[in-house]
C-alpha cells in the first residue's frame, strides 16, 4: 500500500494528488450540507414535498450540462491556461453561495433566493468535477497510462470517505448546530480547495482547436484557413505600401492594425475550436451504437418518478426519525454502494448487460415494495422496527442502484471513440443527470397530483404503487442495449 502510494506520488506529484483527493472528498462530503438544505426547505420554509423536490430538481440542473463546461475550458484558455483558471472560478462559485446563505438570513428564508444560490453552487461543483476529470485524463496521458485505474480508484475512494464522513457528521451537526452554522462550516472545504489551486502548476496551452477533433473537421478547417489567408495577405501588402508613404504614422497605424488582427485571429481560433468540438461531439453521439444505449438509460430515469424527497418528509414527520439516524442511514447507503460495486466487479461482469439491467430493475421494484410495507405499517405487525426497515432499504437500494449504474459506466467508457473520450463521457454523465432531474420533476408532479403534502400522506401508498409499475417500463426498451454486450465487451 505504502509502495503504491509512493509510486503515485512519484508519477503525479503530491500537490496534484492532494487536489484530486480534496475535490472528490468535497463532492462526497456535500451530504453534510445538503441534509441541512433538506431540513431548511421542510422546517424553516415549510415547503410541501413536491415544492421541495422542484427546488432540488432546478438546483441540480447544472450537472446536466457538464459537456458545456468541458468544451469551454478545452477551447478558450484564460491567461494561456485551460484548467487551473476554470478550477478557481468553479471553486469561487461553490464557495460564495454557502457564505451568503450562512450570513444572510434573507437569502435562506426565501425559496427563490435559496434555489438560485443552490443552483450557482451546483454550477461551481459540476464545473470543478469536469475540470478535475480533464486534469486527471491529461496527467495520465502525459505521465503514465498504467496508473489510469489507480488514479480513478483514489478519486472514488476519496469521494466514498467524504460521503461517509459527511453523512455521519451531518446528522450530528443538525442535532446540535443551527443550519446557518452548518452552511458556514462547509465553506472550509471550498476555501481550502481554492488555496490548493495555487499549488498545482499548469503549462501554458496553445490556442489551437482540439487536435482530436481536427481530423473530423479537416476539410472545413482548411477551407476556412485558405479563405482567411488571401484577404490577410492583401491587407498586409496594402499596409506596407501605405507605410512607405506615411512614415512613422503609418508604422504606428500598422502596429495597431496588427494587434487588432491578432485579437481577431485569436477569437477566430476560439470560435473554430468550439465549432470543431461541438460538431465532432454531435457526430460521435449520433452513431446508433452510442445513441441507442444512452437513449435507454435516459428512458430508464424519466419513466420512473423519483419520490425520494416525499419519503424524506414521511420518515421525519410520520415515523419521527431524527437527523442523526437519517445520517446513519446514509452511511449504510454508502456501504451498500461500495458493496454493490464489489459484487458487480467480482461476479456480474460476464453477464450480459440486458440481463443485469433487468435484474437491477426487478431489485429496484423490491426496494419500493419495502417502502410500501413501511407506509402500510405492515412491518410493525411482524415486529420489525421502522429503523430496521429504513436501514435495510437504504443499503439494498443503494447497492442495487450501483448495480444499475456500473453497466452505464462500463458501456459509456467502451463506446467512447478515441480522442474525445473525456468530453463524450461527460455528455453521457450529463444525460444520466438530466434523466435524474426529469425523474425528480415527474416525482414532484405525481406527489402534487395525488395531493401528497406535509401532514397528508393518505395517497403515499398509491404513489409508491405507481412507482413500482413505472419501474418495469424501461424493461420494454432493453432492445436498445447491444444484445451481446457485457461488462467485458460492449459489442
UniProtKB/Swiss-Prot annotation:
Q: Which residues lie in Basic residues bias regions? A: 237-248
Q: State the CDD domains in the record.
A: MFS_FBT (cd17484)
Q: Which residues does the annotated region (Disordered) include? A: 222-262
Q: Which domain of life is it from?
A: Eukaryota
Membrane topology per the entry is: Multi-pass membrane protein
**Keyword Transmembrane helix included in the entry's annotation:** yes
Subcellular location as annotated: Membrane
Give the stretches traversing the membrane: 14-34, 52-72, 84-104, 112-132, 154-174, 179-199, 294-314, 323-343, 356-376, 389-411, 437-457, 461-481
Q: Where is the composition biased (Polar residues)?
A: 224-236
GO cellular-component term (any): membrane
Entry-linked Gene3D superfamilies: MFS general substrate transporter like domains
Q: Does the keyword Transmembrane helix apply?
A: yes
Which residues fall in a compositionally biased region of kind Basic and acidic residues?
Answer: 249-260
Q: Which SUPFAM superfamilies match?
A: MFS general substrate transporter
InterPro entries per the UniProt record, alphabetical: BT1, FBT, MFS_trans_sf
Keyword line = Membrane, Transmembrane, Transmembrane helix, Transport
Recorded hits in NCBIfam families, A to Z, give: fbt (TIGR00788)
Q: What does this protein do?
A: Could mediate folate transport.
> Which family does the UniProt entry place this protein in?
Belongs to the major facilitator superfamily. Folate-biopterin transporter (TC 2.A.71) family.
Name the record gives this protein: Probable folate-biopterin transporter 4
